[in-house]
Swiss-Prot record:
One of its GO terms (molecular function) is pyridoxal phosphate binding. This is Probable ornithine aminotransferase, mitochondrial. Belongs to the class-III pyridoxal-phosphate-dependent aminotransferase family. GO terms for biological process: arginine catabolic process to glutamate; arginine catabolic process to proline via ornithine; L-proline biosynthetic process. Pfam families: Aminotran_3. The lineage of its organism: Eukaryota, Metazoa, Ecdysozoa, Nematoda, Chromadorea.
Length: 422
């Protein structure tokens, strides 16, 4: 039967390998939604902290798919796990038990020390699930009247572009002309404990959700002790403390989770991106029974969430972080990278900031950060600007000392040469 099916399948169009970069750009422009503005580079291969374009040029990857490939591109352990599980069982839905989900649930809850995990797929799904859990807890446990729960977010947050996510956004690029928005959301300035306290005094507040380090805002770090202050305030006013660790977590900041820098234990933690090492969309919500067990069968779910392939990949991705000491490497290599970046002339780069391998530079506004990224690309390093004047540097956590030094040399030379020519 398969052979007869193959005979009727039409031949595929010309493969991407034989296309030039420009042909790839043109095809995407013609057939795809124009919801991204990528750097003009067409990638076809990745390994460790490097990627190659279709013409064979090699680049340092200093974006790491927005921290989804912390373990490095095409990690051999992840590749093996995917191949083995994909040949056995990939998806059952949650209509049935499978033999892998429980293994993953036990592993991830013991690793992060929470009672329960809710398995999802993407970061935005997991964040939205956290909001749902917080609302239900507010009604069932805190005693908020139905449909009156409020969730507070930090300004300049980013957790996706679903209707709920943009309802919490303060970035017009995300929310403008997409209303009406989800009610019951409020925002307060980031890194401002008084603003948090003023907002969560309201008896209807269910939760405060915050990124320990704001990624899309430009790797913005709060003052030391901010998260501890938030945690204390949430306890004082009986409000759930949620950390969005989708981008900042899993070693990126030099700690397994970024909120570990402040020695806090949030009520809910959201994970994603590097939870699969770039092989598969996997996300998770972690919390204790007093929050998680308010959700009953049929009240929340996901066809793909907790599937066998995702679970095996997530276990392997977390094992790699520990076995290869990538969290520790992030801390050491991050210090090295930051020390190099801080040698950039202050009249060109006004600010260098970061933790671990989660770094950013702020370019003088008279220079165009997008054009700097184009020059970096020409010189063999890929990075992406955000908010016009900020360039993020976040390579895979497997990068070594020699590679950091080579990459830093590219950055320093590119930025200084660009300033001289402009």
């Amino acid at each position: 039967m398969l052979s007869s099916l193959r005979r009727v399948v039409p031949s595929l169009p010309r493969g991407s390998r034989s296309l030039t970069s420009q042909q790839i750009f043109d095809r995407e422009k013609k057939f795809g939604c124009h919801n991204y503005k990528p750097l003009p580079v067409a990638l076809s291969k990745g390994e460790g902290c490097f990627v190659w374009d279709v013409e064979g040029k090699k680049y340092f990857d200093f974006l790491a798919a927005y921290s989804a490939v912390n373990q490095g591109h095409c990690h051999p352990k992840l590749l093996k796990v995917v191949q083995e599980q994909a040949s056995t069982l990939t998806l059952t839905s949650r209509a049935f038990y499978n033999n892998v989900l429980g293994e993953y649930e036990e592993y991830v809850t013991k690793l992060f020390k929470y009672d329960k995990v809710l398995p999802m797929n993407t970061g935005v799904e997991a964040c939205e699930s956290a909001v749902k859990l917080a609302r239900r807890w507010a009604y069932d446990v805190k005693g908020v009247k139905d449909n009156e729960a409020v969730v507070v977010f930090a300004e300049n947050n980013f957790w996706g572009r679903s209707i709920a996510a943009i309802s919490a956004s303060t970035d017009p690029d995300s929310f403008a002309r997409f209303g009406p928005f989800v009610p019951g959301f409020k925002t307060v300035p980031y890194n401002n404990l008084k603003a948090v306290e003023d907002a969560i005094k309201d008896k209807n507040v269910a939760a405060f959700m915050v990124e320990p380090i704001q990624g899309e805002a430009g790797v913005v770090l709060p003052d030391p002790g901010y998260l501890k202050g938030v945690s204390d305030l949430c306890k004082k006013y009986n409000v759930l403390f949620i950390t969005d660790e989708v981008q900042s977590g899993l070693g990126r900041s030099g700690k397994l989770l970024a909120h570990y820098h402040d020695n806090v234990r949030p009520d809910i933690v959201v994970l994603g991106k590097a939870l699969s090492g770039g092989f598969y969309p996997v996300s998770a919500v972690l919390c204790d029974d007093n929050v998680m067990m308010n959700i009953k069968p049929g009240e929340h779910g996901s066809t793909y969430g907790g599937n066998p392939l995702a679970c095996k990949v997530a276990i392997a991705a977390l094992e790699i972080l520990q076995e290869e000491k990538l969290v520790e490497n992030s801390a050491v290599m991050g210090d090295l990278l930051m020390s190099k970046l801080k040698t950039l002339p202050k009249d060109i780069v006004s600010t260098v900031r970061g933790k671990g391998l989660f770094c950013a530079i702020v370019i003088n506004k008279k220079y165009d950060a997008w054009k700097v990224c184009l020059k970096l690309k020409e010189n063999g390093l890929l990075a992406k600007n955000t908010h016009g004047d900020i360039i993020r540097f976040a390579p895979p956590l497997c990068i070594n000392k020699e590679q950091v030094e080579q990459a830093a040399d590219i950055i320093i030379k590119t930025v200084t040469d660009f300033a001289k020519q402009n």
